Each structure stands twice: as structure tokens, then as C-alpha cells.
Amino acid sequence: MIEKLMHKYALSKQGASDMIKAIISATISNIILMVPVALLYYLVRDYMAGNLGDKVLFYVAGCLIAFVLIGISTYIQYNATFLSTYVESGVRRVTLAEKLRKIPLSFFGKKDLSDLTSTIMNDCAQMETASSHFIPELFGACISTALIAVSLFFFDWRMAIAALWVLPVSFLIVGCSGKVQKSLNKKQMVLKMACADGIQECLENVRDLQSYNTQEDYMKGLTGKIKAVEKHAIVTELGTAVFVGSSQMILKLGIATVALVGGVLLAKGELDILTFFMFLMVVSRIYDPMQVSLQNLAAVIASGVQSDRLDEILSHEVQEGTNTMKHDGYDIEFSNVGFSYETGDVVLKDVS
């Protein structure tokens, strides 16, 4: 698993281990956020039973414990996610620079300066954002939601299905858009590289452009490249928004199906009001983080282009050879050397 994460997200071995820790901490943090929901459920149950007065201290202590647990889990999640991410960021940049120093020169013949500069700067920055904001939150939300979903079936399987059917459908919509998003992002990257290459070329040849009075013609072509990047950026964002927006709209249908199925079962007497109330609370708590998870999933898919570019360099074969050189038979010897001027003044005589 660690090896797969290393190639998937261009991580070091330690970075992959830290990524797993960040996912676990995000999962635990999300589960702890359900503690207030559980307290509210038991509060309503005791209130309806008429014995709330005997358990005031229990709920006060429960609120304090929940507050402490949320604070501790958030602190651990922050350290496991953000601090480790930026430590890994430094390792990634140094490793990338060392790799560029050791790989064969034939690799650089296939790349231009703007491409390599973008890989070192922009791609690394994009993967930093993905590692700190998108990936741990996405996997943590999926794992915690799966655990909560399993627990819902122990209360009422019909209500659980009504609440959860929208989750796989929503993720399937965003997941199936992966090829479209990757295609759009690859084209966007090509246009960005062409634009960056044009700007770099302009800076290097600005004197020649002025000498031949071709600034206006060159700037027209460069302006066209910039506009092409802007236009395709709109298309890329729109393509992502169509899938994410559609999946979020379907996610909202879960609240309606829970209310509808719960109302029917309640009218038939097959469901008590307390369980109905609990499911309404749970779906309101689950769906909001899952909307963010859908955006994170789209962002993770989009960052696959940058990850592939980094992995191309990090996985490239290193130039073979030795780090030390042994000089055998190449000594320069200064033996019996003499030197004098034409006037006969001797400067050196039999010097070794």
C-alpha cells in the first residue's frame, strides 16, 4: 500500500506513511464529531421518557468530554495532515532536484525549460495542496461514513437504505468523470506550457525583437496563447462543475427520501418517532461533509496530471557510473625543468 501511495501521489516512503496516519486521524476526527449527535439522541429520548432531570450531570459531563475529544482529535489531525505535508514538501523538492541532477541528459532533450520549471514549482505546489487539503479529508470521510452507514443498518435497514442510496450514486458520477477531467487537465497543462514557453522566449529575445521591430507581431501571438489558457480554464472548471454539481444535487435527494420513507413508516406504525428523528439528524450531519468530499474527489482526480508528471521524473532511471574517480597513469610530473632568458639569466635549473 505504501509503495502504491508513493507512485500515485509522488511521495517518499516516510511521506506515504504520514499520509496513512493523516487518513486515520481524519477518520477518527469525523467519527468523534458524531458524539454530539449521539448525545442529542439520548437527550431527546430521556426528555420523551420524562426522566431528563435525573441525568443533567451526565449530559453536562458528556458535552465537556465531547468538547475535549473534538479539540484533541482536531489538534492531532492538524499535525498529522498539515505539518507532515510541508515536511514532505521539502523532501519532495530536494528529491526532485537530486533526481534531475542524476538522470541522463537524453531526458532533458525531450523537455524544455518551462516544462521543468513548472514541474519543480507548480506541480509540487499543487501536490502540497492535494496532500494537505484533499486526499486525507476524502479518504477519512469515506471510511468514517462507511462505518456510520454500517451502524445505521442496526437501527432500521429500510431507513438506512433511504438515507445512503445517494452516496454511491453521487460518487459514481464524479468517479466516472475521471477520464473527462484528466483529458481537460492535460490539454490545460499543454496550453500553460506553451504560454510559459512563449513568455520565457520573449524574455530571452527581447533585444532581438526590439532590434527587428517585431514586438507587436510577437505580442499578438503571445496574447493568443494567454487567451487560449484563459478560455480552456473556463471549459475545465465548467466540465468539473457539471459533474460535481450534479452529484451534489442527487445527494440532496437523500434528505427527501429519508423524510418520505420515514413518514410512510411512521404512519403505518412501523417506525417510532425517536428513530425517525435520529435518521434526520444523521443525514443532515453526513451529507454536508460528503458534499465537500465530492469536491475533494474531483480535485484529487484533477491533480493526477501533476502527480504523473512528478512520478515520470522520480521513476526515471538514474545515470549509472561511480561517484569517485581513480587517477591511474595520468600523473603530471615536473622533472629536471630549466628556464632562462635569451640574455642568459637562469631562472630555473634542474627543478623537479
Question: Where do the language-model regions lie?
Answer:
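Cytosolic ends of transmembrane helices, especially the final helix of ABC transmembrane type-1 domains
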Residues: 214, 238, 285-313
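Hydrophobic alpha-helical segments in the permease module
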Residues: 59-74, 167-171, 240-254, 273-295
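Transmembrane helix-loop-helix hairpins at lipid-water interfaces of multipass membrane proteins
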Residues: 19-73, 153-158, 270-273
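Primarily ABC-family ATPase nucleotide-binding module
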Residues: 314-352
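Membrane-integrated ABC transporters
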Residues: 1-33, 52-59, 77, 81, ...
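Hydrophobic alpha-helical transmembrane segments of ABC transporter permease domains
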Residues: 24, 28-36, 41, 121-166, ...
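An intracellular "coupling" helix at the cytosolic face of ABC transporter transmembrane type-1 domains
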Residues: 10-18, 105-106, 122-131, 135, ...
